[in-house]
């Protein structure tokens, strides 16, 4: 049972949400009085309550989603809130649906989407993973953060070939190393206000670290938003190469570290928007003609379930007509299908851009 102080904070938060008429978050949409009353006293075995789930969305009324999972059990215990939000965000992943088993498919189906190098500046594919036996950020102790970092360090240190590299803990990082990682756009900063409010940044920078290979095409973030973010990237449009590198890395890491997986929801992550495959395949792409015709851009993006963001990711503008375009769907389809959909969409956008020139 949640304690009285928590429940009174929850009542306050619920009232604030109800009163916020211009709040458009999925939290507000699905946290009805019935659902609220059903869940407000519940507590996971690690001690997480509904407050941990909703506090970021209560504090930041401009959130798109507004909920985070404090631990794996939260997805089950607070399902009356999570399930409809997941269904809404993941476009029809119904509460009776089951996410398919992991399937990276035939990695040779992926190509260089821009062999002439005219449009695509860089290509990146990432996935998130949570380590089994540990809660997500809000419930982690400092000792757990450090223990996880040590496990990740020893796992990554044994990688060989193209994936071989170095691990840099954020704690006690030398200024010159820090600057170098910032210049390479590798260093992650302490979480934004959405993550801060979700208590995702406690004991910072304890237990946080960055690994990258010698070519700087493979990167692992340890304990940023998720326990692990595994990233493969390079300049240009060779999606095939980027995808193959990611798949071999994930397979290698998985041999040594068991990941949290849910029968229905797939791989578990802190934010419900990343569940399932957890895969985000993206390009930084110059589309000057389509940039001037935003409606057409959005129409094609919609057809292939692509998400169009500004150059520096979420909540940013496109600088010089350069967009960050990625697959939007992560659930109810395989890893292969998610990336294939993105490849098809990017090829189509490039074709249209060429026709408009």
UniProtKB/Swiss-Prot annotation:
Gene Ontology BP, a term: phosphocreatine biosynthetic process
Residue span, Phosphagen kinase N-terminal domain: 9-91
Keyword vocabulary terms for this entry: Acetylation, ATP-binding, Kinase, Nucleotide-binding, Transferase
Pfam families: ATP-gua_Ptrans (PF00217), ATP-gua_PtransN (PF02807)
GO cellular component assignments: extracellular space
Modified residues (N-acetylalanine): 2
Residue ranges occupied by any Phosphagen kinase C-terminal domain in the UniProt entry: 119-356
GO molecular function: arginine kinase activity; ATP binding; creatine kinase activity
Known EC number: 2.7.3.3
Residue numbers binding ATP: 122-126, 185, 229, 280-284, 309-314
CDD domains with a match to the protein in the record: arginine_kinase_like (cd07932)
Recorded catalytic activity of this chain's protein: L-arginine + ATP = N(omega)-phospho-L-arginine + ADP + H(+)
Recorded family membership: Belongs to the ATP:guanido phosphotransferase family.
Protein name: Arginine kinase
Biological source species: Pachygrapsus marmoratus (Marbled rock crab)
């Amino acid at each position: 049972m949640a304690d009285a102080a928590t429940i009174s904070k929850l009542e306050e938060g619920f009232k604030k949400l109800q009163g916020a008429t211009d709040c458009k978050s999925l939290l507000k949409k699905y946290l009805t009085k019935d659902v609220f009353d059903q869940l407000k006293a519940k507590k996971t075995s690690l001690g997480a309550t509904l407050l941990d789930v909703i506090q970021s969305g209560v504090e930041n009324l401009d959130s798109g989603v507004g909920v985070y999972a404090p631990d794996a059990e939260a997805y089950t215990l607070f399902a009356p809130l999570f399930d409809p939000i997941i269904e809404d965000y993941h476009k029809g992943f119904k509460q009776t649906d089951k996410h398919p088993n992991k399937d990276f498919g035939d990695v040779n189906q992926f190509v260089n989407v821009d062999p002439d190098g005219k449009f695509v500046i860089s290509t990146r594919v990432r996935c998130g993973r949570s380590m089994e036996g540990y809660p997500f950020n809000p419930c982690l102790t400092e000792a757990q953060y450090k223990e996880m970092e040590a496990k990740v360090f020893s796992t990554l240190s044994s990688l060989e070939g193209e994936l071989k590299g170095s691990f840099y803990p954020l704690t006690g990082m030398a200024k010159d190393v820090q600057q170098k990682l910032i210049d390479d756009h590798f260093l992650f900063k302490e979480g934004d206000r959405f993550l801060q409010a979700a208590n995702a940044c406690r004991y910072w920078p304890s237990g946080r670290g960055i690994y990258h290979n010698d070519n700087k095409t493979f990167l692992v973030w340890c304990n940023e938003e998720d326990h692990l973010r595994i990233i493969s990237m390079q300049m240009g449009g060779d999606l095939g190469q980027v995808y193959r590198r990611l798949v071999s890395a994930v397979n290698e890491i998985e041999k040594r570290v068991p990941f949290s997986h849910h029968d229905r929801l797939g791989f578990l992550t802190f934010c419900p928007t990343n569940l399932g495959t957890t895969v985000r395949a993206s390009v930084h792409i110059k589309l000057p003609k389509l940039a001037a015709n935003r409606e057409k851009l959005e129409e094609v993006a919609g057809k292939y379930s692509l998400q169009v963001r500004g150059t520096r990711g979420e909540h940013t503008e496109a600088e010089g007509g350069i967009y960050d375009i990625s697959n939007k769907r992560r659930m109810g389809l395989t890893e292969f299908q998610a990336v294939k959909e993105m490849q098809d969409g990017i090829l189509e956008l490039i074709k249209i851009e060429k026709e408009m020139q």
